[in-house]
Amino acid sequence: MALNLEKKQEIIKAFATKANDTGSCEVQVALLNERIKLLTEHLKTNPKDHSSRLGLLKLVAQRRNLLKYIKRTDHVRYVVLIEKLGIKDR
């Protein structure tokens, strides 16, 4: 499941730390979070789509690793990000 360009630009603008910032951890986590939401909805309607389920698991692992990195380097940034995204703290 791909994000459309407008939605992607909106997410980048909301989570960018400076102008033209597309690669910061916050932006990456926000984009992954949106893709995870889309795939979750897809899997609710198509429960036998195993390749999408594996892709979802990979995206969740990637998001978890990025969040772990942010938590380790700057805890305040981590707390703000998970509150903005509505992700539970583990």
From Swiss-Prot:
GO terms for biological process: translation. Keywords: Ribonucleoprotein, Ribosomal protein, RNA-binding, rRNA-binding. One of its GO terms (molecular function) is structural constituent of ribosome. Gene3D superfamilies: 6.10.250.3130, S15/NS1, RNA-binding (1.10.287.10). Pfam families: Ribosomal_S15. One of its GO terms (cellular component) is cytosolic small ribosomal subunit. InterPro entries: Ribosomal_uS15 (IPR000589), Ribosomal_uS15_bac-type (IPR005290), uS15_NS1_RNA-bd_sf (IPR009068). Belongs to the universal ribosomal protein uS15 family. Part of the 30S ribosomal subunit. Forms a bridge to the 50S subunit in the 70S ribosome, contacting the 23S rRNA. One of the primary rRNA binding proteins, it binds directly to 16S rRNA where it helps nucleate assembly of the platform of the 30S subunit by binding and bridging several RNA helices of the 16S rRNA. Forms an intersubunit bridge (bridge B4) with the 23S rRNA of the 50S subunit in the ribosome. This is Small ribosomal subunit protein uS15. It comes from Helicobacter pylori (strain J99 / ATCC 700824) (Campylobacter pylori J99). The lineage of its organism: Bacteria, Pseudomonadati, Campylobacterota, Epsilonproteobacteria, Campylobacterales.
